[in-house]
Amino acid sequence: MYPKMKNDLILRAAKGEEVERPPVWIMRQAGRYLPEYHKLRAKQSFFEMCQTPETACELTLQPVTRFKGLLDAAIIFSDILVIPQALGMQVVMLEQKGPHFPKPLVVPEDIDLLEKTPNISAKLGYVMDAISLTREKLDGQVPLMGFSGAPWTIMAYMIEGGGSKTFAKAKSWLFRYPEASHKLLKIITDATVSYLIQQVYAGAQLLQIFDSWAGELSPEDFTEYAYPYLVRICQEVKQHLKKKKRDEVPMIVFAKGAWYAIDQLCDSGYDVIGLDWTVSPKEAVRIRGNRRVTFQGNLDPNILYGTREIIEARTKEMIQDFGGGKQGYIINLGHGITPGVNPDDVRFFLEKCHQYGSA
C-alpha cells in the first residue's frame, strides 16, 4: 500500500468536483530547464535515464522538491516513444535535434516487421518500476501521473523518422494507404491500452494522452485517423479497470492544435481536455456548455520569458477566463515548458497561480 495522499486536489478537479483552488502542474516539468536535470543528464543518455528507474524517479521528483508545495502533481519522467521501441523499432535521441528513427516505416509491408503484440510488462517494465518507486518516494505529497502518446502522433514519428515541418511522409500514408494506416493505428492503440493499464497497476493515479501532432490533421482526417483511437484508449482502459474493480483513474487528452475538435473531445469520455494557447478559454467554456468536463491549460509557454508583470497579468487573466478555477479547471501551460526558462520565473508563475486561484 502506498502512503496516504496529503494533496488530492488534482484528482478532485479532474473529476469535476468543486475545489478550493485550481490545481497546477506543468507539462515537461521534469526536464531541461532545471540545472539539477543536467547533472544527471551528463552521466546518462536520454533513454538510459528513462530506462533506469532510480534516475527516472529522481528526475520526476526534482520539480516537486524544488517547488515544494507549489505543484499539485508529479508526472513520471519517460517519453512517448517507448511504444515504438516496444514494437521493435530503434529510437535514439539526438542532441539539439530530438528523436531519430534509423529505420522508419516506408511502405505498408514494413508493418510486418513490427512486433505486433509486444509483452508490455517485459518490454517496458522499467517504466512501471519507476512509477512504483516514485509513488513510494512521493510519500503522498502529490498524485503521480502516467502518460503515453496518442496513436496518430506515434504513427507520425514511426513514418517520418523524427519530428517534421510538413509531415508529408506520414500524411501521404493516410491518403495512399488508408487501410494500412488503420492497421498500424490499431497496433499502436492495442499496445498503448496495455501500457496505460500497467501504469495504473504500478501506481499511476492519472493518465495523460499526448496527441502532439493532432493539429497537422484536417478536421475530417482527425475524425477518421485520430479521434476513434483516442476514444478506444479511454473506453478500454476505463472498462478494464472497472472490470477488475479498481478505482477509476482520471484520463486527460491533449490534442495540440486541434482547436476544431473541442466539441467532439467533450463527448469522448475523457475527464480532462488539455488546451493549447491558440484556444480562447472563454470560447472553450462556451463550447463545453454544461458537460462535466475539466479543461487544462493553456498559457503560452513563451510567456515565461516575459516580464514578471506580464507573467502575472496573463496568469490572472487566464484563470478568470476559465471561470475562476474553482470547478472544471486545471492550470497548465499550453504545451511543454521550453529549456531556456529560468526556474525562478517558474516559481513566480506557480505562486501567482496559487494567489489568483485562491482568490
UniProtKB/Swiss-Prot annotation:
SUPFAM superfamilies: UROD/MetE-like. It catalyses: uroporphyrinogen III + 4 H(+) = coproporphyrinogen III + 4 CO2; uroporphyrinogen I + 4 H(+) = coproporphyrinogen I + 4 CO2. It is found in: Nucleus; Cytoplasm. One of its GO terms (molecular function) is uroporphyrinogen decarboxylase activity. The record marks D79 as: Transition state stabilizer. Transmembrane segments: none annotated. Its EC number is 4.1.1.37. Keywords: Cytoplasm, Decarboxylase, Heme biosynthesis, Lyase, Nucleus, Porphyrin biosynthesis. GO terms for cellular component: cytosol; nucleus. Coproporphyrinogen III binds at R28, A30, R32, D79, Y157, S212, H335. Its main location: nucleus. Pathway: Porphyrin-containing compound metabolism; protoporphyrin-IX biosynthesis; coproporphyrinogen-III from 5-aminolevulinate: step 4/4. Pfam families: URO-D. One of its GO terms (biological process) is protoporphyrinogen IX biosynthetic process. It is an enzyme of class 4 (lyase). HAMAP family: URO_D (MF_00218). Catalyzes the sequential decarboxylation of four acetate groups of uroporphyrinogen-III (octacarboxyporphyrin) to yield coproporphyrinogen-III (tetracarboxyporphyrin) with the formation of intermediate hepta-, hexa- and penta-carboxylate porphyrinogens in the heme biosynthesis pathway. Acts on a number of porphyrinogens, but only coproporphyrinogen III can ultimately be converted to heme. Belongs to the uroporphyrinogen decarboxylase family. Monomer. PANTHER family: METHYLTETRAHYDROFOLATE:HOMOCYSTEINE METHYLTRANSFERASE RELATED (PTHR21091), UROPORPHYRINOGEN DECARBOXYLASE (PTHR21091:SF169). This is Uroporphyrinogen decarboxylase. It comes from Schizosaccharomyces pombe (strain 972 / ATCC 24843). The lineage of its organism: Eukaryota, Fungi, Dikarya, Ascomycota, Taphrinomycotina.
